[in-house]
Amino acid sequence: MKVLLQSVPRYDRTELPQVTKHLPCNPSIAFHGGRLLCAYRGCNYDLREGHFQFFYGSGPSRLPDSQSYIAEIGSDLACKSVDFIEDRHLRATPEFADGVEDVRLVPFRGRLLALASGVNFQPVLKQKRLIGDSKMILAELKDRKLHLIRSFDSRNPVEKTGMPVLGREQLDLVYSVSPFLLI
């Protein structure tokens, strides 16, 4: 007789720390340099409540804000360390004035690349739009800093992070806005 419980898969989980008041979400996991790494986002709103009430510090805010983190995960799935992903140099440009969000880790040819959405929410304030501008970017994540390789302009007002497709020493990126477009 076979006991069914022995054939049931086992699930483990890890908890990503809330570094500031921003709530953790959107993890991306990659194995690179002999380490299990996890990039994740901290956002200033709670998606679980069914509405978007933005906050910044101790008060309400009119705009969303993101922080990006990089964590190292141990073999026991415990979070060994966490730190900010540096994007202030990108925030200093008009194109990405509000930073990056939804970082996706892509180990490729010995480098740790990152796909992300670079955002600017000024159109929300100036043009009374509901959503800001965003562009997909490709960067190298090195020493916790995003080093921009290039941004992609598909002429869509909103771009969310694409999905990497690795094959035959080539890296293709699939746009989520248009999943049949490879770049």
Q: Model-found features: residue ranges?
A:
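Beta-rich carbohydrate-recognition and catalytic domains
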Residues: 1-22, 31-95, 107-160, 165-183
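Cofactor- and metal-binding active-site motifs of prokaryotic enzymes
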Residues: 99
